[in-house]
Amino acid sequence: MVFLDPTEISFPDPEFFDSENGLLAVGGDLSPDRLQFAYETGLFPWFNPGEEILWWCPDPRFVLFLEDLKISKSMKKVLRDEVFTFSENTCFRTVMEECRNAYRKDQDGTWISSELIDSFVELHKRGSAKSIEVWQNDELVGGFYGMQIGKVFCGESMFAKVSNASKAALIYFVKNHPELEMIDCQIHSEHLESMGATMISKKNYLTILKKQA
């Protein structure tokens, strides 16, 4: 594990630095420039409130290749019935705040701090961070946000206030962004596995990511 200098934007190269649980570095800050560099390098922040910032690059990595997307019969009906409408990048900060407040069985979203939100909003203004919004009767009921690095979208967090909203968001995003090659889902979830996400080695992940430079 490497302890980062908050005055210098650098990370250990994950290609040559291994750890048993994927934790590569501690410390630094959550500035927009550091976050941008982290995602370009293959790392992402994930930590508990009050702790130092932890930077991860797990091996294996959980990803969704767009051609592997699975849409269940029930979801096809939801989409066919136009239960939801969708938008992109219309309320980025609100999507992050909803992700922070969302209930999660195995974790909470409180690591999405106000500082992190402010930095991501700046990255959104720069065009790197993006959001997908799901609406029902003019109410925001689901969505997600993340960072786009070339043809790789690094999904950060999602929320759903009604059934199927987050699944619909992902399907919409994949269908409307054929230019993408892969969605980085970071760590395993049954929800995303059911939609086609799979594990690949860190080496393969970094190979794909480096092609985006």
Give the location of each predicted region:
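N-acyltransferase acceptor-side catalytic subdomain
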Residues: 1-213
